[in-house]
Amino acid sequence: MNELIRKTNELLKNHGFEYAFCGGWAIDLFIGAQTRKHGDIDILAYWAERDAIIQYMQSLGFLVYEMLGGGKAHHITDVRNQIKCKRNIFCCTQDCEMVVLTETDEEGIYFIDFREVGQTKLNFIEFLFNDKDETDLLYARRHAVKLALSDAILYSGGIPYLSPEMCLLYKSTDTERKGYQSDYDNAMARMNQRQRRWLSDALTIMYPEGHKWMPL
């Protein structure tokens, strides 16, 4: 497996919180090979462990920002002072070349500009927070759409990753984004009948008027 993914997994494992790789890297972990260049590392995590993750990343020297929408982010210096209007945070080193932060008139709020340079160093991680119950992972956009945890979190060489059907459901909101269609094509070629059926049912619920990826 890719050395960057291995190092990230070593950084995150055994620190008291659950996680799984998501996004394009999760598709590659499912396939068993790198299929394209990836912009960054995306990690699925859970809301209940958000503070613990922030504090751990800060202890490693990472700067932590929560996304606000509108091209802005809030620098989290204290977990007691969060806005929590979006489900994702990003953690970067001081010298990370992947993001440019510009001060606004508001204290602790920055304009953000992500550079599509492709990540090659362990200097940036984005966490996307989700909910779960005792048995299922809940889709963030509609909790009624759920997938058994045993099916949602898979492993490749001991590295946890989000299953392809759930990854593709998240990617379905922006199919024109670079790499998303190839992720769909590559994953669909290898998904089993149960995975395809779950994705088909989920797309039908989320897009009752139809979707580019329907029917499967």
Predicted regions and their residues:
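Compositionally biased terminal segments of proteins
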Residues: 1-216
